[in-house]
Swiss-Prot record:
The keyword Phosphoprotein does not apply. It comes from Streptococcus pyogenes serotype M49 (strain NZ131). This is Probable GTP-binding protein EngB. It comes from the Bacteria. Keywords: Cell cycle, Cell division, GTP-binding, Magnesium, Metal-binding, Nucleotide-binding, Septation. Its cofactor is Mg(2+). Residues 28-199 form the EngB-type G domain. GO terms for cellular component: cytosol. It holds the Pfam family MMR_HSR1. The gene is engB.
Length: 199
């Protein structure tokens, strides 16, 4: 079923930003969290699959997202953009604070249905990417791995890069893996299929 028949994906807005659970929305709408390294393309992913240009702000300055940003989609679903990890210029104490905030959300939020874990298709996953995937598997949280920036690689090499990413993550075949490009609009339907399957 096409996503337009399920919900109007263009009817989306940023709802609120939260530093801890006391600020989370108090209802039972399903939520999909988005996690990934700084500058992996989370904001571009959100904007692309929602068909909006600047709903999630893209930044040339990594580490800009410092709160959990909740996006309301047609009053039926929420995306939760979590702070990008792996940015060296953020202080150790700040990184620890973000880590605690992300962990609290991922392990205690009943609304959470799945996590879209974004990785860069061009490179082997970072230590933080692997830690995030392992964390989600440990807590039995459904994972959708989205490999971004596919347009930067010739199509003939996608399978090779996908294999490298999956091997490094020790990828569970029961999870979903999607090759994605915001520039070429590749992987949008597959992403929605995977998301809606979880909600």
């Amino acid at each position: 079923m096409a996503e337009e028949q399920v919900l109007n994906t263009h009817n989306a807005s940023i709802l609120l930003s939260a530093a801890n659970k006391s600020h989370y929305p108090q209802d039972d709408l399903p939520e999909i969290a988005l996690a990934g390294r700084s500058n992996v393309g989370k904001s571009s992913f959100i904007n692309t699959i929602l068909g909006r240009k600047n709903l999630a702000r893209t930044s040339s300055k990594p580490g800009k997202t410092q709160l959990l940003n909740f996006f309301n989609i047609d009053d039926k679903l929420r995306f939760v953009d979590v702070p990008g990890y792996g940015y060296a210029k953020v202080s150790k104490s700040e990184r620890a604070k973000w880590g605690k905030m992300i962990e609290e959300y991922l392990t205690t939020r009943d609304n959470l249905r799945a996590v879209v874990s974004l990785v860069d298709l061009r490179h082997a996953p970072s230590k933080e990417d692997i830690q995030m995937y392992d964390f989600l598997k440990y807590y039995d949280i459904p994972v959708i791995v989205v490999a971004t920036k596919a347009d930067k690689i010739p199509r003939g090499k996608w399978n090779k890069h996908e294999s490298v990413v999956k091997k490094a993550l020790n990828f569970d075949k029961s999870d979903t893996f999607i090759v994605f490009s915001s520039v070429e609009r590749i992987g949008i339907d597959d992403s929605w299929d995977a998301i809606l399957e979880q909600v």
